[in-house]
Amino acid sequence: KTSTRTRCAFEVAARDQGAGVTYLEPSASQIGHKESIKDTARVLGRMYDAIEYRGFGQEVVEELAKYAGVPVFNGLTNEFHPTQMLADALTMREHSGKPLNQTAFAYVGDARYNMGNSLLILGAKLGMDVRIGAPQSLWPSEGIIAAAHAAAKETGAKITLTENAHEAVKNVDFIHTDVWVSMGEPKEVWQERIDLLKDYRVTPELMAASGNPQVKFMHCLPAFHNRETKVGEWIYETFGLNGVEVTEEVFESPASIVFDQA
């Protein structure tokens, strides 16, 4: 997958530590097309000390890790976004003023993919009070939920999944969301997704429903919060929404810490 923040973060971090970086564009690589993942892994593993992969299937990054012989970092797959979790955990720690195991956060929206999955597992592993607010059809898979509950038994985390957005955000320190339509999905899914998720939009009213005047808003970006992008304008013209998963008022408010997070 193409990238802005993830690529820049990896390249800046590597160069700050004195490492060289090579970027292979999706269109310029033969991975999985003319050369198998297994063969590519064994070639790159002989040239590089580490590999960062950002793509679609989790099975690809796992196969790279199996055969490369060097560390492989998951920069994002459809299923997980672990390096974003490092940023999210640090951001919550910086802004909460209390230990993570005393911190509560909610994720509202489509929770089936990398951010919903990863935040649920993150909260469980760190002993946090983590809530998912979404229609049940958009919850993480049973396997992810089971893994979160297993981790929570070890850490004392509290896991809540609910279809009630206001219940999800009650007394939390942070409210997370993400885009409602993921990269690679067709435009045709927008109407269905908007119908399903309209009650999970992060608005000033939902922020207030937390009952916490210090609650913070988080989003891994990019966000559809206004009409200033081609997609944002198309959504407005097609569905009448100025901002989708979050309103401009929340995104640009003092409660928004998305740029610290990103």
UniProtKB/Swiss-Prot annotation:
Localization, UniProt: Cytoplasm
Lineage: superkingdom: Bacteria
GO MF assignments: amino acid binding; ornithine carbamoyltransferase activity
Effect seen on changing V60T: In strain: HF116
Pathway this chain belongs to: Amino-acid biosynthesis; L-arginine biosynthesis; L-arginine from L-ornithine and carbamoyl phosphate: step 1/3; Amino-acid degradation; L-arginine degradation via ADI pathway; carbamoyl phosphate from L-arginine: step 2/2
Catalytic activity: carbamoyl phosphate + L-ornithine = L-citrulline + phosphate + H(+)
Positions with a binding annotation for carbamoyl phosphate: 3-7, 30, 54, 81-84, 219-222, 247
GO CC, one annotated term: cytoplasm
Alphabetical keyword list: Amino-acid biosynthesis, Arginine biosynthesis, Cytoplasm, Transferase
Location (main, coarse): cytoplasm
Site feature location: Important for structural integrity: E94
Family: Belongs to the aspartate/ornithine carbamoyltransferase superfamily. OTCase family.
The protein's name: Ornithine carbamoyltransferase
Species classification: Bacteria, Pseudomonadati, Pseudomonadota, Betaproteobacteria, Neisseriales
